[in-house]
Amino acid sequence: MANDRKSIKFTDKKGIGKLKLKGTRDLHFYSFSQIKRVRLVRRASGVYVQFGIDVDRKENTEPSGNTIGLDVGLKEYYTDSNGVMVENPKFLLRSKKVLKRCQRRISRKVKGSKNRGKARQILGKRHLKISRQRKDHAIKLARCVVQSNDLIAVR
């Protein structure tokens, strides 16, 4: 990490060198000793630098005294012991039309061409969006269940 904290230099002999950092997170807030790990991650939407930071995270929650049992299924996302059923959002089925169009565009391009590569990038971004929607939905539901109950039993 450079002294201005606007760039990072990789010295692991992979030939990456110096990269400029762009983003919303303020790295001035963390000291160099708190940064434990740095990773380069390539996704369909671009290349990202991930920082692993050693921070104690504490949340003050009051015990609610509630217990709940969850049954995860295929038709419903989950059913709890109180009779509440959460429907499966089916993000893949909702965006099926867009994915079909992207697949058709790829199949019409010449193999090895720049335009086929661009079409593959677009399809990759669509799949990445679906996976992020699924992950976001799962995290939000899990957080809601965990915060509102003290004991959770999963079948």
Q: What name fits each language-model region?
A:
Residues M1-V41:
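Acidic carboxylate diad motif detector
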Residues S33-R37, R43-R155:
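Substrate-contacting helices/loops that form the catalytic groove of nucleic-acid
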